Amino acid sequence: MRTQSLKPYHANYHSLTTNDSPARVDAPTDSGLISEFVYSENQPVVTQLLLPLLQQLSKQSRWLLWLTPQQKLSRSWLKQSGLPINKVVQLRQINPLSTVEAMEKALLTGNYSVVLGWLPELTEDDRIRLRLAAKLGNAYGFVMRPLNDTKVGSGQCATLKIHSYLYH
């Protein structure tokens, strides 16, 4: 996988649209990215796909942010994966519905090369807001959503799960 460095870009979020003109973004088209990953927890292919990109992005001077509402990242997994512990920030125990807003704000700051968020299903408005924030912050945003692999009728609730080996 080849990764291209992102050009720095700074703009005032509120100056991008006006009431008398159509919405527009002055950011270059390659200055940010939002991707949604819907994955099966039984097949950790997402880890295999994302890890090289995360390792590359960790070489930037900016942070890597993990928005994980319920779980705690495993320091041993970070070390084993080659991700710098001193550049990883994690916010957890936040309301999953507030995670979209938290992700948008984090992307806008420009302090993070990548923001990973475990989010509920996004609305089109959420997608637009996150894309704009990623462009303005010159960052990657990865929306992570595991498929509901829990069998109906097995007595288990449908909950958000993250691979346990990633967390304590």
Curated annotation (Swiss-Prot):
Name the record gives this protein? Cell division inhibitor SulA
Q: What induces it?
A: By DNA damage, as part of the SOS response.
Q: Name the Gene Ontology biological process terms.
A: division septum assembly; DNA repair; negative regulation of cell division; SOS response
NCBIfam families to which the protein is assigned, alphabetical:
PRK10595.1, SOS_SulA_coli
Q: Which organism is it from?
A: Yersinia pseudotuberculosis serotype O:1b (strain IP 31758)
Please list where the region (Lon protease binding) is annotated. Answer: 161-168
Query: How is the protein altered post-translationally, as described in the entry?
Result: Is rapidly cleaved and degraded by the Lon protease once DNA damage is repaired.
Keywords, A to Z, come to: Cell cycle, Cell division, DNA damage, Septation, SOS response
Physiological role: Component of the SOS system and an inhibitor of cell division. Accumulation of SulA causes rapid cessation of cell division and the appearance of long, non-septate filaments. In the presence of GTP, binds a polymerization-competent form of FtsZ in a 1:1 ratio, thus inhibiting FtsZ polymerization and therefore preventing it from participating in the assembly of the Z ring. This mechanism prevents the premature segregation of damaged DNA to daughter cells during cell division.
